[in-house]
A protein has these predicted regions:
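Glycan-processing catalytic domains of CAZymes
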Residues: 23-144
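Hydrophobic h-region of N-terminal signal peptides that target proteins for export
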Residues: 11-19
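Secreted/periplasmic carbohydrate-active enzymes, especially glycoside hydrolases
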Residues: 1-3, 20-22
């Protein structure tokens, strides 16, 4: 049953045409295209989503010794940043981004365009959009 459902999802995903956001260009096939998945699931307490440090938070919040990220993001090109409890070796505070900000999504898509990606699949996990908070957040990201 799971195998059949997975095949159905695969067929549905690949049977629809792709439209680029800016130009409205329609592709008839995925052959030769470079596609990516986009989650957009990071939040910060002051981003307006009311989800706190979502997807950054470890077993005891988002603070030194408790986080779920493997690497600190390079944030120099983001327009809006959020101060964290983390500090760099020189003692300066570490900042990060929120996917809830339209400017963050714009930055990510600009990077993908600059590096030659042809399109993106917006990934929406059922467990993430089951509640109103998650649904509102991911709709905001999708509409950005």
């Amino acid at each position: 049953m799971v195998k059949r459902f997975s095949w159905l999802v695969f067929c549905l995903l690949f049977s629809v045409g792709i439209t680029a956001k800016g130009g409205g260009r329609q592709y008839n096939s995925y052959k030769g295209l470079v596609m990516a998945g986009y989650q957009g699931w990071f939040n910060a307490p002051d981003d307006g989503a009311n989800r706190g440090w979502y997807h950054y938070t470890g077993h005891d919040g988002f603070r030194p010794g408790s986080c779920t990220i493997d690497f600190w993001p390079e944030v120099s090109e983001y327009k809006r940043l959020y101060k964290t409890e983390f500090k760099f070796a020189d003692g300066t505070p570490a900042y990060t981004f929120s996917s809830h900000d339209e400017s963050t999504v714009d930055t990510h898509f600009r990077w993908m365009k600059e590096y030659g990606l042809d399109g993106v699949f917006m990934q929406r996990f059922v467990g993430e959009i089951r509640g109103e908070s998650g649904l509102k957040h991911f709709n905001t990201v999708l509409n950005s």
